[in-house]
Amino acid sequence: MDPLKICENYLTFRAIIRGSTLSPGFFRRWCFPALADVVGNIVEQEEGRFWQILPENHAFWGLLRRGFTVASFTEIITAAQLENRGRQLAFLAFISFLLRNWPSDSVVPEADRLDLVCAPAWSRMQIWSQTARLINDLQDSVLEEQGSAEEEECEEALLAGDSDDPLFG
């Protein structure tokens, strides 16, 4: 299961996050993507760690209460490192944790909260995915160029008779 691949579509990503905020049971398991149940279970198991990262008295919760979401989420989301599946799942779980614990007295309507969190988080995942793909493509092309350069050198040496190999000297 590759979370980056599964979350390529925004609507699928949104459904995963929405499903992961629900309590465990039949509805979450059968009405949402399978990854929603996995992420929801991670949130429930690691909630204590998430509270250590972002305690209840942290200024972040006050900003959410007052509706200042852009700067808050930008700072948290851009710091995410998504280089392996474990970190990707932890990122999804943390996003779900934020939604689950959004202050109930916030000026942000409940209907808008999901998209306020999902849009920047999904963008971050897409940027990470594209960057990883570009790096892999670049590494592959460098390896191919090195291989073809070595082959050309060998061919030139053979044609010129300058080879160190006693069979071709």
Curated annotation (Swiss-Prot):
GO BP of this protein: symbiont-mediated suppression of host apoptosis
Keywords: Early protein, Host-virus interaction, Inhibition of host apoptosis by viral BCL2-like protein, Modulation of host cell apoptosis by virus
PROSITE patterns referenced in this protein's UniProt entry, alphabetically: BCL2_FAMILY (PS50062)
Tagged with keyword Magnesium: no
InterPro entries associated with the record: Adenovir_t-Ag_E1B_19kDa, Bcl2-like
Keyword Nucleotidyltransferase assigned: no
Highest taxon of source: Viruses
Annotated family: Belongs to the adenoviridae E1B 19 kDa protein family.
Record's protein name: E1B protein, small T-antigen
Organismal lineage: Viruses, Varidnaviria, Bamfordvirae, Preplasmiviricota, Tectiliviricetes
